[in-house]
Structures are given as C-alpha cells and as structure tokens.
Curated annotation (Swiss-Prot):
Highest rank taxon of the organism: Bacteria
Entry function: Catalyzes the ATP-dependent conversion of 7-carboxy-7-deazaguanine (CDG) to 7-cyano-7-deazaguanine (preQ(0)).
Keyword Acetylation listed: no
Residues involved in Zn(2+) binding: C188, C198, C201, C204
SUPFAM superfamilies reported in the protein's UniProt record: Adenine nucleotide alpha hydrolases-like
Family affiliation: Belongs to the QueC family.
Name this protein carries in UniProt: 7-cyano-7-deazaguanine synthase
Length: 226
C-alpha cells in the first residue's frame, strides 16, 4: 500500500487532511510537533485523532523553536490578540514553522519510502501566513525534488495541500462528507488544558464563520458562551 506522512496539529484543517489521505487509500503516518505552543491541548487532540483514524504510526517531535520567541503562540511576553480581520501578517505567525515541519516530514517520508506528504495549509479564510500560500507549496516541492535521494532518482516525494484553494466552509463540508468528527479537534490559539476555545481569536472566528457558512452545527466547546 502507498504510504503518506500527514502533518496533524489537532486542528480542523489537518484533521480534514488526514481524512482525505485515508480516503485516497494511503497507509497513513501522522506527524505532530510540540514546538512550545501555549495551546498545548491541541497535541492531546492530535493523539486522539491519530488513534481514531487508526494511523500506522503517530510521532510527536519536540522542537525548541518556541525558545526563540517572535510569535504570540509561543512567547509568553506576547498576548494572542482577538480577531483583527486585517490583511497584515499577524503576531500569531510562527517564523518559518511550516518550512521546519515540512523539512522533518520530508526526512521521515524518505525513510519510510512514502510517496506523499499532506499538509492542511489553506490560502482561503486563513490568517495571512506566508507559508500557507500555493507558491510556497510549489517552492517546497522544488526543494524536495532537489534535496532528496528519491528526488534525484526521479521518484520525488509529492507535497500535497488538498485544502489550499478551499474556504473554511468547503473544508468543513469535505470533512463532514468523509465522516470527520470535528468535536475532537482543537483550533483555538488560546485553548485551555481541556481544549475549550476562547471564541475570539483569529482561529476561533474563522472556524465559527466556516461552520455558519457550511450550515453545519458547530460542535466547538467554549470557555464562556460566545
């Protein structure tokens, strides 16, 4: 059976991405990262989601990039803001995060002799992160072609971003059609230890908007009523 490495954070998009990989018939290897994120409950969700989808293996790699600061998701001196709705790159951007994650995924995929890596990046209804754009995915594909033994031998590992052109509502509809239980997911940047959401950060607002537009009941549990 063909193999794939799927990046899973415990959130809505990456869980949908895992469901897509399963629907394509991949033997799934899930990869998560403990990078010093404040919303650590997403990793608890990732463990449950990986087990739910019966992945072959789930690895959680510990990184120390949070020690470098520079993002409200990792730096205790920076507060995660409420939803701003502007087009500038927000303070929740973690510098080079997807490049670091995909590089490790690329190494594992080559070790496994996997043919694909799937990432839940989306350029629609997103927070404006530069490493979630189609041109970024294309650039990393070029890197994968050049930087691996498989690539040099003409069997390059494919970098797939199946949600890249989908709105949040379209992503939710897709996942719903594949049987995803979104109550298992944690998207909030300020989620507490139980995985309850704040309801006001960028991620929460985009998630609420997605369920509303998809006309699907939002199963998200909030710290306080929003």
């Amino acid at each position: 059976m063909k193999k794939a490495v799927i990046l899973i954070s415990g959130g809505l998009d990456s869980t949908t991405c895992l469901a897509v990989a399963k629907s394509k018939g991949f033997s799934c290897y899930a990869l998560s990262f403990d990078y010093g994120q404040k919303h650590h409950s997403e990793l608890v969700a990732a463990e449950k989601i990986a087990a739910h989808f019966n992945v072959v293996r789930h690895e959680v790699v510990t990184l120390s990039i949070g020690k470098l600061g520079g993002s409200a998701l990792t730096d205790n001196s920076l507060d995660v803001p409420d939803y701003g709705g502007n087009e500038s790159i927000p303070i929740t951007y973690v510098p080079a995060r997807n490049t670091i994650f995909l590089s490790i995924a690329l190494g594992w995929a080559e070790i496994l002799d996997a043919e694909s890596i799937l990432i839940g990046a989306s350029a629609i209804d997103y927070s404006g992160y530069p490493d979630c754009r189609p041109e970024y995915i294309a650039a990393f594909q070029n890197l994968a072609n050049l930087a691996t033994k498989r690539g040099i031998e003409g069997h390059s590992i494919k970098i797939e971003a199946p949600l890249i052109h989908l709105s949040k509502a379209e992503t939710i509809k897709l996942g719903y059609s594949l049987g995803v239980d979104y109550s298992m997911t944690v998207s909030c940047y300020r989620a507490n230890e139980e995985g309850l959401a704040c309801g006001y950060c960028d991620s929460c607002e985009l998630r609420k908007k997605g369920f509303k537009e998809a006309e699907i009941k939002d199963p998200t549990q909030y710290i306080t009523k929003v």
